[in-house]
Amino acid sequence: MPLLDSFTVDHTRMNAPAVRVAKTMSTPKGDTITVFDLRFCAPNKDILSERGIHTLEHLFAGFMRDHLNGEGVEIIDISPMGCRTGFYMSLIGEPAEKRVADAWLAAMEDVLNVVDQKAIPELNEYQCGTYEMHSLSQAQDIAKAVIAAGISVNRNDELKLSDEILHKL
C-alpha cells in the first residue's frame, strides 16, 4: 500500500491549533488544488469530542466558505479527521496560511454566535446520518479554545519524517 502524505510528517511535533499545507496538486486543466490540515488539537494529546466535532462539521463548512471563498479560492470540501484532532480542507487555489488562519478564526467567532442548536444546518434525519449526535455547547467550547490559543502554522519541512525513521516504522 502506498505511504500517504499525511503519514510522512511527525505528529509528535505538530503545533495546534495550526494550519498546514498538506498537499498541493495541479489538475490536467491547470487548476491548483490545495489540501490543508486544520489541526485543532495536538495529536495523541487531546481529541475533539464526538458531538462537538460533528456539530463543527455542520457549522464550520459553511462559515469557512463565507470567509475564504473568493479571490481565486473555492472550497471543495471540509471533513473531520478520523483521529478527531482536526479537519482536512480541500480547495481550488493557493491561499496563504495566514488567510486560512484568519478565515478559521472568523469561523470560530461565527460558531460562538449561533444561539440555538436548532440553528445548526442540516440537523435532521434526511440530511444527517446521526442527526441526534450533536452538541452546540461542545462545538462552542472548541471554538473558544481555538480563539484563546490562536492559530499557528505547521510547515512540512520542519515536520518531515526521515527515510530512516519511515523504514523503521
Curated annotation (Swiss-Prot):
Entry keyword annotation includes Lyase: yes
EC number(s) stated in the UniProt entry for this protein: 4.4.1.21
Residues reported to bind Fe cation: H54, H58, C128
Domain of life according to the entry: Bacteria
GO biological process, one term: quorum sensing
Coiled-coil regions, chain positions: none
Enzymatic class: lyase
Annotated disulfide bonds: none
Keyword line: Autoinducer synthesis, Iron, Lyase, Metal-binding, Quorum sensing
Cofactor descriptive note: Binds 1 Fe cation per subunit.
Subunit annotation: Homodimer.
Family: Belongs to the LuxS family.
Protein name (Swiss-Prot/TrEMBL): S-ribosylhomocysteine lyase
The species this protein was found in: Shewanella amazonensis (strain ATCC BAA-1098 / SB2B)
Native organism taxonomy: Bacteria, Pseudomonadati, Pseudomonadota, Gammaproteobacteria, Alteromonadales
